[in-house]
């Protein structure tokens, strides 16, 4: 199917993904479309969206329309992603062995946990190894990582500590990403408090590990998606993660018994429904009854946002950075002003980068000035964008995100209507 609101090349990328996820359901492209397409742009778009292997696997049947140069570059890029996947998977395998040997409970988040729902798990591109441990074991596990050759990397974040190996980046989570402020955040923490008690044992060719049980995995994906969408930006890889999860589990009772009642409780139901229907419309996956009424125009706007930004906002850095005016990476929804978001985000950044502030609040003004002048210097050097220059991008993005009602209770949504 070809969608008029998207370019030929974007339509082909979507077709290639549908063909990869559901080969028996998706027909082929017409000769006219293949001949008119810019296949280099198709390749580049798949790369910007972090889905080059899936797209290349399906594109092989259209090789006669793709120049040898482009085909070989796509092949080489896919090979490089495969090599990265192997390194990351090996790093995870060694990490799991260390944790299990020492008796630490853990869960692998996203990454290979998400890939396990794909028809071909090896086609899902990997980045970091994200894993969750008990919060009070964070220091012990951190020391264990250092003992085994890892180095602490960067400053602490609100939910994880990063470590670097020679071959991979590890993120030691003491909390999952995307948990909001306020009452919704407390409800999420209460929902996830027993997350480490069980777990889903996953056996892949790259190694065995423990992942979250399905209701937890679903919530982790939703929190992660909105965290990045309202942050630097979401890519098609994230959308494929959700599509594959829904496709594999749509008929499981946990949706009606556990997950959907909870996302309604915290104000994520509209978001979940829109993302699910977006997957159904454009990636060909199942659309459960609970998502059938999601606004198709909003779904189209969400996909347009994904195409404009690319994976982690890599297609347009200014647009990605405009997130500082929209929301603090989704933690407070989208109901605050640009000034509030800018100031609140700046405070959170300073607090994370300079932990000494938490011990002596009098240091805050000092580090506010340090970070403020640092940003000003980078801005004058042309290495950062002025918040004023990002207002138009922020307004355009926020107009879409407001329709998703992230962390808004249904009563409030009805009042707004």
Task: Annotate the PLM regions.
Residues 1-127, 133-417:
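Conserved NTP-donor binding/palm subdomain of two-metal-ion nucleotidyltransferases/polymerases, i.e.
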